[in-house]
Amino acid sequence: MMEVEAARVLWRRSVQRHKLRYTTLLSDGDAKTFAELTKIKPYGEDIEIDKEECINHVSKRLGSALRNIVTDCRKRGVTLGGRGKGQLTQNAIRKMTIYYNRAIRGSNSVDSMKKAVMASLHHCFSTDDRPRHELCPTGVDSWCFFQEALAKHQVPGPHDKLVHTPLNEKKLTPHLMPIYKRLSEDQLLSRCVSGKTQNANECLHSLIWARCAKDHFASCKRVQFAVTTAARV
């Protein structure tokens, strides 16, 4: 609740102290702060506060969802993350998370973002016998090795080497598709279009906590000193 209370104070005093309004909240996925600001309406009924998502935190949701589905299926006696070929290994999950982040970061509209997200999944399913690159970007600058080779009038290389062991589409699609559909919904992606992250904020926080550990009590002067010196770095 500390973040909620801090936001309540910052938003309510912004006009009086700084003569400005904070009309956008860059969220890390925690809905409590945004819900509170929507409730108290610090700038009145006519001025709404919009919510945008940190694309790094959104990408982490995919990794968490994939690891959770592996764990849940294991409890039911279904192996998705074993060592066999085409399994949803930790390396595969890391790769898919990177692809998802790149799909969001490299798109400037909800439609293009949605297409890029699904392209990243189909790319991971692709094999020499059944290439699934129809949604991947075309051209010589494409991140997709298959489309890049076609644009250069070359024969694409082997999928086992360039996709790094394609995922078992038949086995994994029923488990992965609901996750990808949920994480490519218009409402979520519309909050990611600006491509913003909380990197700068988290970097500043790490500098502050290095000077004043947040798990120990500190005086007001100590906290002010930590904030001031961190901001000067």
Regions found by a protein language model. Give the residues of each.
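Short, surface-exposed amphipathic charged segments that create phosphate/polyanion-binding patches used
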Residues: 61-75
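Phosphate/oxyanion-binding active-site loops and adjacent basic polyanion-contact surfaces
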Residues: 1-7
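Acidic/histidine-rich catalytic cores and adjacent linkers
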Residues: 8, 12-52, 56, 74-233
